Amino acid sequence: MAIPDEFDIIVVGGGSTGCCIAGRLANLDDQNLTVALIEGGENNINNPWVYLPGVYPRNMRLDSKTATFYSSRPSKALNGRRAIVPCANILGGGSSINFLMYTRASASDYDDWESEGWSTDELLPLIKKIETYQRPCNNRDLHGFDGPIKVSFGNYTYPTCQDFLRAAESQGIPVVDDLEDFKTSHGAEHWLKWINRDLGRRSDSAHAYVHPTMRNKQSLFLITSTKCDKVIIEDGKAVAVRTVPMKPLNPKKPVSRTFRARKQIVISCGTISSPLVLQRSGIGAAHHLRSVGVKPIVDLPGVGENFQDHYCFFTPYYVKPDVPTFDDFVRGDPVAQKAAFDQWYSNKDGPLTTNGIEAGVKIRPTEEELATADEDFRRGYAEYFENKPDKPLMHYSVISGFFGDHTKIPNGKFMTMFHFLEYPFSRGFVRITSANPYDAPDFDPGFLNDERDLWPMVWAYKKSRETARRMESFAGEVTSHHPLFKVDSPARARDLDLETCSAYAGPKHLTANLYHGSWTVPIDKPTPKNDFHVTSNQVQLHSDIEYTEEDDEAIVNYIKEHTETTWHCLGTCSMAPREGSKIAPKGGVLDARLNVYGVQNLKVADLSVCPDNVGCNTYSTALTIGEKAATLVAEDLGYSGSDLDMTIPNFRLGTYEETGLARF
């Protein structure tokens, strides 16, 4: 079908939010309404790297074709490193390639935005509208059961799930039924996933909203591999977008095409790209735009500011050789891969139907733990967290394998503790360096530039390390991926114990347990059993580690050297008063209806609109913003009542999966 040059509505960016907006609006009861969805990446339909949940780590590789990697300025807070922040580059955005973890924000998160229509109570009907909750539920008033996005445990659970939960419970972290109830901030749970259990497939935004609509409607036009250069503004009104090929034929003289919008343009390019599009369009800090050769149209200093993320780090551990993990599969073992693919294609179950992240916690410190923090952090905690008991400080979860480059570690079986800071105090920015859409931005994510972010990450390392050491599967620490404690420190990371090492090696191995004291020290045996030092299934425990100030310094150094993005960035087009607010001090970009200040018919809708952080994996928030934005656009067009349902056609088994789909 030929793509016309003019539409009623143009949605620029086919990520998690953009797909939701375009899919909903194309289902308005108006056969003459046309919607264009413009996406820089490729179409994701029938892509096994998308729909198979268990292959998601491949999308994190630096040579991935499904992500764009942005490099930051060098940072003193990261010991001189540059942060690398990937952004999805495929239809469906992050929902096509993320970790698939189902997590929802705390109620106070949305309330704190203080924007009309955006409180948790007001958003709850839209949050429920998103999902089909595919598990028994005691909170039916908080979940949805007929939405386009499916939520389940997948069709396979690694045994590290119950092992982790027993260990966490022994630390005083209660195991709860529903940690995503908007209020529980301290607990452990069997973690749900954005996976359709009926199909064994990832539940991404494009397959949920866009592809079903395009199979049933003629009103939605999809334009892929196309980058937005700028919005064209005439007499204060957004009237068109100028686009260029995603891959430049001639970067110095880009070939462009302009698409006009009769009613509305919605920018949904993500936290890094949305402010860059606005800046190239003449919307941003006027002095900066002039300095890079762009004529200012609207002076909005907040564009590109207030960059936030969740700060993540990983710590791996050995597990006993009989513990199932995904290591052999991701390492490329042909037997493991054939078995997993055969099981998925035959039954839609097995290890390819999970992300291997089976259990996790949200935690807040006790008064005793908080007393060990520095004074600056305690003041910040008192101001931000004390009166908001629904906000967790940290998250960590167990991954059933080594999450990282397997060429850098020996063969074996592992588990990885995956941590992220829920509400960092640090802030950053992203700015264009020229009017050329292919030029890299000036980017400083601000990771750890506020030292108050260090104590909770040190605390989480200690907490998760004790969880790991209390797990029955625990067999030692991958010392190369832990802090560099002093040799004589009791906190020093230790390798496989002797018995486990021998079990891995087998009877014919000649060098297993060869003593090489300058390189490795085995883990101690667990302490003798006593009533106060066992988990609920009577597993003996290793003694708790006591840390010195010197040990804490080693952990801080490790965190500075290894903290990275969690792919959860937000905030650069903040929905806040134009003059700014406490949570968006450099100025707001959007009003409560997502309109860009000073321009008619132009909205922004993606995670960049969040003026403050959310304590969750952000796919749920991106979808919530999408549902809200679709409603706002429809209301602007004059729709109300049941017309705002904009029901998506059902995703039916076999609709997208072609017979004989080639395996990897």
UniProtKB/Swiss-Prot annotation:
GO molecular function per UniProt: alcohol oxidase activity; flavin adenine dinucleotide binding
Keyword match Plastid: no
Positions annotated to bind FAD: 8-39
InterPro entries the UniProt entry points to: FAD/NAD-bd_sf, GMC_OxRdtase, GMC_OxRdtase_N, GMC_OxRtase_C
Location(s), subcellular: Peroxisome matrix
Top-level taxon in the UniProt lineage: Eukaryota
Subunit-structure text: Homooctamer.
Protein's name according to its UniProt entry: Alcohol oxidase
Name of encoding gene: MOX
